[in-house]
Amino acid sequence: MNNTYRKLTAQEIETLKSQMCTAVDWNEIEVAEGFAPKYVRWARMSGHIRLGAFNKEFCLPGGMKKHSGIYYATLHNVTVGDDCCIENVKNYIANYEIGEGTFIENVDIIITDGPTGFGNGVEVSVLNETGGREIMIYDRLSAQTAYVMALYRHRPEMISRLKEMIRSHVSSVTSSVGYIGSNVTIADAGYIKNVKIGDYCKIEGASRLKNGSINSNMHAPVHVGVGVIGDDFIISSGSSVEDGVTFSRCFVGQACKLGHNYSATDSLFFSNCQGENGEACAIFAGPYTVTHHKSTLLIAGMFSFMNAGSGSNQSN
């Protein structure tokens, strides 16, 4: 991201005004060298704003091309990197740093509100839905650490030390400013609040994402698809969550796939798990746990290298 910014010139301010742009205080807006005001139209800005240079053209499916810039959007305390396209934001974007080459279109609202750990530090009542074996999720959670925290409750001093280390990580990531990485796509999404989004992530049609981290990167991007509703979560690299999945207080490990209206609460899914159609409540899904069937309900169990068959209903 460009670290060299300057104030707007009087001519640039007049150009922006002629393009129906407004600002609470034009002195609070800084731009990168190479900034061209012609690519900012119908924008409302408040707080401290930083804008990059808009030179890139996005090639969209079907052959459509859109030039980077800001069109029909309201921004408050936002840094926009070079070559981003932000268009048709129904409400506003507030308190975010946005990397380079990111495409945001047709979204309702994207905000960071107050200090947040972005899903880090959330307690998940795994293995016992009434509590007692809670695990604090964080970006680097492993199956081994989670196993010890859940099953070694007879070692309270060790559990206390583990929680201290996790809280230290939570403190290091807690911020009042959210982050959207470089080359991210967010399109046709609804409500996004207190979510950290890594590089090359694609969010397409998600309904609601609240208090979470999506740890995507260039080599293992994350896809969040249509109709997804997520609260208090962490999604690790290379995973996909799509097709109407609803999940709350969940950790999704690397290369996992959740889809086809899967529902999960207070559960941990470690690497290479797959969940479709069914339900999960308070489960510890170790690596390669798979469930495909609508009639499958997994509750308060620990699994690994398992394919749950049709009718695996643990509520009976």
Residues of each region from the PLM?
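Domain-scale signature associated with acetyltransferase and cell-envelope carbohydrate enzymes
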Residues: 1-316
